[in-house]
Amino acid sequence: SFLQDFVFKNFMYSKQDDYEKQLTQLGIMEKDAYTCTCYMDEVGNTPAMGEVLSWSESSAVVYANSVLGARCNRNSGIIDLMGSVVGYVPRFGLLTDEGRKATWIVKIETTKKPEAQLLGSAIGMKVMADVPYIVGLDKWLGGELDDAAKTYLKDFGAATASNGAVGLYHVENITPEAVKYGKDLIAEDAKVYVVDDAELQRVYESYPVIWKKKDAKPKLCF
């Protein structure tokens, strides 16, 4: 609507044109090159295993660490920016071998393939900022890191990062570090969390329905 466009352009996003101009001057790939999935092949910026990054977007960080085996902390925007400028970031946390050890063993004991975002939410809310080593998920992902598994883990990881604060997870027999090091990635005092059908149902039912009409359908989704 005219009113909606007017409010967005003149109030909510009034500085957007300025930001886009600055990004163009910095060398952005193209005018539509805005994405939270900056690791995708089509972006041309896919990190290699072991490569150190200066990123801050939480779902990108957890994907890079877990699925690609790169190394990156959940940086603030300032650390992200300064790391990109000077070419260095502080060496701690998920940049270190010790910081990448799993302090949780998560056992998947569901009777069917768990919905990625629900499973990610369950694990994220349980382990928060810790590193989980996930056992049994490979049964549902086909045993290899193919495109289907990457898509699943993209959604799964985003949920662990947003409903918790997970920056790295290992999936046994699937993710690169888990394939290379196996259970050597697990810390000696790791805790255990079992995810079965009942646990996923508990997490699902814990989400509040804040609409006046519980069965209503949304007009807009973001």
Could you tell me what each predicted segment is?
Residues 1-221:
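Non-transmembrane, aqueous-exposed alpha-helical and coiled segments at domain scale
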